[in-house]
Every structure is written in structure tokens, then in C-alpha cells.
Amino acid sequence: LGLSVLFISSNIALAAAVCSNLGILYSGEIVESGSAKDILQNPQHCYTKAFLSCLPTPEKKGMVMTAVPGRMPDPLMKPEGCKFHPRCSQCEQICRETRPMLHTIGNSHAVACHIVAPLDGEKLRTGE
């Protein structure tokens, strides 16, 4: 149809049912984008992984639900570098200092993360 619709929701199951492609936002910035199937089955950004791990699933029935650790940054005082770095379990010094750019890591998958590098699809740790 050649139709584009901006559908904003924190209900990722609904968004995936309605949309063929997703853009994951954190603190007003796209941190990951790609096909709904790819993002749900192979999330790359630490925020996407943390967000998806908090969602209720049949396998988690009866378990205590968790939240993404930490707090959202104040919109008027956002941190330098990656906006998710204060909450990220894989944060490195570069994450604190330099804002990551959106890099293509697959046919239609892109991520803004210093920990995930677009080098032959391999994950790299910075500072090693």
C-alpha cells in the first residue's frame, strides 16, 4: 500500500501485531530499529533487552515481575553519551562520554550502542 503510520505504544506485543517494523525509543531517541520479528527474537540494545525481559509471558506465570533498574533521566538534564548508560549493566567509559550513532547490523536491523558493533555482525566490547 505504500502507507506509513506512526504508532506510539509501550505495549510492544500490540505494536508488533500492528506494525511490520519497530523503532525502540529511550529518552526520546531511537536506540534500535528493525523488523518487529527481528527485534523481538534478537534484541541488541541493552534497553531493548531489559525492557523485553520485564514483560509478562506465560513462562513467567507466578513469578515476581521486575522493572528495568534505575530511573529515567530528567528530560532537562539528560546525561552525556548514551542516555541509557546510567541504567546499563554493560556500560563502558565510551558510553558515558560519547553519544552512539545508529549503526546497521543486519539487513534491516539498526542499533545505537557502543557495545554492539557493526563488524561482521559480531558483538565487540570496547576498551579491550
Residue map of PLM features:
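Catalytic metal- and UDP-sugar-binding loop of GT-A-like glycosyltransferases, i.e.
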Residues: 25
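Short, glycine/charged-rich "phosphate-handling" switch motifs in NTP-dependent
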Residues: 21, 33
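Conserved H-loop
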Residues: 2-8
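Helical segment within the ABC ATPase nucleotide-binding domain
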Residues: 1-2, 13
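A short, surface-exposed alpha-helical micro-motif characterized by mixed small hydrophobic
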Residues: 15-17
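Catalytic "switch" loops of ABC-type ATPases
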Residues: 10-11, 51
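Charged, flexible cofactor/metal-binding loops and thiol motifs
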Residues: 35-128
